[in-house]
Amino acid sequence: MNEKTLYFAYGSNLNLDQMARRCPDAEPVGRVRLDGYRLAFRRTGGGYLTILPDKGNHVDGLLWKVSAQDEQALNHYEGFPHFYARRTVDVQGKGVGHQAMVYVMNAPYKDEPERPSRYYWNTVLEGCRQNGIPMQPMLEAWREAEQACRPQKHRDTFESPDR
């Protein structure tokens, strides 16, 4: 039997083209919501999205069904187990709850705000557009990283998501 795992994507893996390359067996299930978390760009040297606990907030994302081979590919791309850890979360979509696997950035990386590269930013935004995911939380996460990193400049990050 080829059982598939439910996977909650909230960053660059919202992008349908990227997921088709990385995980050819993956099937999008639909938009879902994770309550009690917010998005944040973290990691020195070029920010990547993670989720951080925040009771008054939520993260919109995409639920995928992934095969065992897809999971292995995701583990590789997400730097599991060192950069990201895997967790199980409860997500809601169209009034139905699901338990899904999610990648959450580990310490010390999650404690280091950083702006994303333009390439990563554009990949995430295209995924939002493709799936009808609101972009405002992405902008808020970018602004939070910008405030924390204002005195520093990194060669691969950019000054404003509006340019």
Residue ranges and their predicted role:
Residues 1-163:
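Glycine-aromatic micro-motifs
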